[in-house]
Amino acid sequence: MSHVLVNVAWPYANGPRHIGHVAGFGVPSDVYARYERMKGNDVLMVSGTDEHGTPILVEAEKEGLTAQELANRYNRVIAKDLCDLGLSYDLFTRTTTGNHEHVVQEMFKQCLENGYIYKGTQQVAISPSTGRTLPDRYIEGECPICHAEGARGDQCDACGNELDPDELINPVSKINGETPRFEQTEHYFLDLPALAEANKAWLETRKGWRTNVINFSLGLFKEVKPRAITRDIDWGIPVPVKGWIDNPNKKLYVWFDAVIGYLSASIEWARRQGDPEKWREWWNDPACPAYYFMGKDNITFHSQIWPSEMLAYNGKGSKGGETGPMGPLNLPEQVVASEFMTMEGKKFSSSRGIVIYVKDILARYPVDAVRYYISVAGPESSDSDFTWAEFVRHNNEELASSWGNLVNRVANLINKNFGEIPPLDEDSMTNEDRGLLEEASAAFDVVGSSIETHHQKHALSEAMRVVGDINKYISATEPWKIKDDQARLGTVLHVAAQAVSDANHLLAPFLPHSAQKVWEALGGTGTFSPLPELKEVEDLDKPGFTYPIITGDYELGVNVHPWKSEAIEVGAMVPKPAPIFAKIPTEAVEEELARFDEALAARRAAEAERLAAEKAKLAAE
């Protein structure tokens, strides 16, 4: 058994998450974690809500809430949505815990002691109307490098380069359209140039990364500049330096603290297990690989920023230094970044109403239909488009008609003719029988290899190919016509049931909810595919502060079945089957498109009204 660390990008707690978000960080990470558990590996899968930074302050102000109140609201919303989606976190937590604050400050202090954090000045954008510092991504303008419009103050999506707000040409605030003013203020900086050589050398040893991810990551080192890691803001983690720690208007920058969440969540998980040092098995053992799942807009933070922080903490940059008490910390084995998903040809945008939230789609459609569509049509290595027509087609043709109907046919024939799993009569077996069993068994290596190399679309297509071949076997053997040879009928149905069971194992990482139903349809008892649960807990360091976590029991041999062909149990009672998947009426496509258009129009009207009010307010002042 090996240890495997699965780190999942932290959703920002300024609103509910939509289907484009979970297509990048959610379902792919869960498929991988479930597969590794079935392989017998000891997986630690962690994440949580990212809750600091100016965007939360801005949204809270709009709603008349404190930043903590807004974070509390969306922490609960997001945790429930991700739990309902079946994402099997060992711990899904948040960044406003006392534990996270302690770990972040420990990281900062060791990096400072090693010389990789220093004090300097930087121009920051200020809102003339409020006097508040504007977050980088709330400023837009023309990119100074590729001259694309709509570049943000932290990055240009068109060319992928990192930017500072004062580099933009004709910058404006996304909040109210005003032109920001820039002022010099004192900040702490992470000395990325002093870490660049070690960071790049590590990147050059990476193998098996998606081409777009490794090429983009290496491109970050053409020009490396120090990055400010503090902000003039009253919402965030205090800066652990004398003269700063008690300053209410100086906090650590959200991107510095958020990536440390992988480590702090692992430590919190260990503390909640009653074994406070257990996290080290995943973070300090160089043999333990760490896989990071996210959308491509987060590549920079996981192939440059977070590795640089760990190198600084480990004392492995050009300035040397001592490894801190939490180290040495393992750098990522692989950064698994998906591309972007659009919706009906348009870029997802909550503010513009181009969105389908996780909660809404799960309220109307089965969870595994959503997971299947993301897996088969998601943005694995190129941008993809969510369309309602394709969502319905994949569900109806592949899940309901092909897979679900197959399970029902086999279970119904067994129930009707035997009532239990019939024995296999070796004497009546044909080459066709043996061929199907061999194919289904061999598929574990094929599908598993594709999941291990993060080609989940190919893995799913191979699993569904097995489903297709079982359907062909049923059509060719025509068990409903075997009237006078019970031994042969039993053999055909046993072979079919065994192949269906194998296919169910292959599909379980993708379709955990229906996998349980298929298991039970073939006479299985107990848990086959464990699901996560929400639990209300109290903060380990802040008495009275409570919040929900996602956790679960995913122990191999108890709640998790192995990644191999398991012999079905002869004599296991097979009940009259119920449908595993239902077809979605084709009328749903037009209904969803109409709902989408209505929401889009309403959001546009509301946003136009809000901007007009902001401009009128500025004009009056």
Curated annotation (Swiss-Prot):
Classification via InterPro entries: Anticodon_Met, M/V/L/I-tRNA-synth_anticd-bd, Met-tRNA_ligase_1, Met-tRNA_synth, Methionyl/Leucyl_tRNA_Synth, MetRS_core, MetRS_Zn, Rossmann-like_a/b/a_fold
Subunit structure: Monomer.
Cofactor(s) recorded in Swiss-Prot or TrEMBL: Zn(2+)
PANTHER family for the chain: METHIONINE--TRNA LIGASE, METHIONINE--TRNA LIGASE, CYTOPLASMIC
Entry protein name: Methionine--tRNA ligase
Native organism: Bifidobacterium longum (strain NCC 2705)
GO molecular function terms attached to this record: ATP binding; metal ion binding; methionine-tRNA ligase activity
Keywords in alphabetical order: Aminoacyl-tRNA synthetase, ATP-binding, Cytoplasm, Ligase, Metal-binding, Nucleotide-binding, Protein biosynthesis, Zinc
Motif ('HIGH' region): 11-21
Binding site for Zn(2+): C143, C146, C156, C159
Any single biological process term in GO: methionyl-tRNA aminoacylation
Highest taxon listed in the record's lineage: Bacteria
GO CC terms, sorted: cytosol
Catalysis performed (reactions): tRNA(Met) + L-methionine + ATP = L-methionyl-tRNA(Met) + AMP + diphosphate
Top-level class of the enzyme under EC nomenclature: ligase
